[in-house]
UniProtKB/Swiss-Prot annotation:
Its biological purpose: This is a non-secretory ribonuclease. It is a pyrimidine specific nuclease with a slight preference for U. Cytotoxin and helminthotoxin. Possesses a wide variety of biological activities.
Main location: other
Cellular location(s): Lysosome; Cytoplasmic granule
3'-nitrotyrosine found at: 60
Positions with a binding annotation for substrate: 65-69
Keyword terms of this UniProt record: Disulfide bond, Endonuclease, Glycoprotein, Hydrolase, Lyase, Lysosome, Nitration, Nuclease, Signal
Self-association state and partner proteins as the record states: Interacts with and forms a tight 1:1 complex with RNH1. Dimerization of two such complexes may occur.
Protein name: Non-secretory ribonuclease
Protein's gene: RNASE2
One GO term of the biological process aspect: defense response to virus
Length: 161
């Protein structure tokens, strides 16, 4: 009885730990709105090389992000996708605020190859260019902090297909 209870408690702790890690992956820095954080992570590729471009994101999160996709398009173009028909979000079936792009866009997918937990500036990434459709989640803008020209804005890159 005791070993089963102990094993169950360990499994529960591991599960809670995994949920905490997963939840922390979707935390935005407090100085950003969700739309601003989307633009920083997925539109503003500050360098042609993933290793350099990811340093910006990693510095905000204080960790090496495992992967990231940069859409080589404008924020305004992604905002326009928010006007496409609503669909269920593939990554979260309870969310109905996703929209699929009507055409493929060039993108660069960055994948962490060399983690460096002690010094995030040493994280290294491989990059894969592609042309793909994408699905974004969109929400109403933050009325106090987002520009008024876009009432609905992208807040999450849900999937590339």
């Amino acid at each position: 009885m005791v070993p089963k209870l102990f094993t169950s408690q360990i499994c529960l702790l591991l599960l809670l730990g995994l949920l905490a890690v997963e939840g922390s992956l979707h935390v935005k820095p407090p100085q950003f709105t969700w739309a601003q954080w989307f633009e920083t992570q997925h539109i503003n590729m500050t360098s042609q090389q993933c290793t350099n471009a990811m340093q910006v994101i990693n510095n905000y999160q204080r960790r090496c992000k495992n992967q990231n996709t940069f859409l080589l398009t404008t924020f305004a173009n992604v905002v326009n996708v928010c006007g496409n028909p609503n669909m269920t979000c593939p990554s979260n079936k309870t969310r109905k605020n996703c929209h699929q792009s009507g055409s493929q866009v060039p993108l660069i997918h960055c994948n962490l190859t060399t983690p460096s937990p002690q010094n995030i500036s040493n994280c290294r990434y491989a990059q894969t260019p592609a042309n793909m459709f994408y699905i974004v989640a969109c929400d109403n803008r933050d009325q106090r902090r987002d520009p008024p020209q876009y009432p609905v804005v992208p807040v999450h890159l849900d999937r590339i297909i």
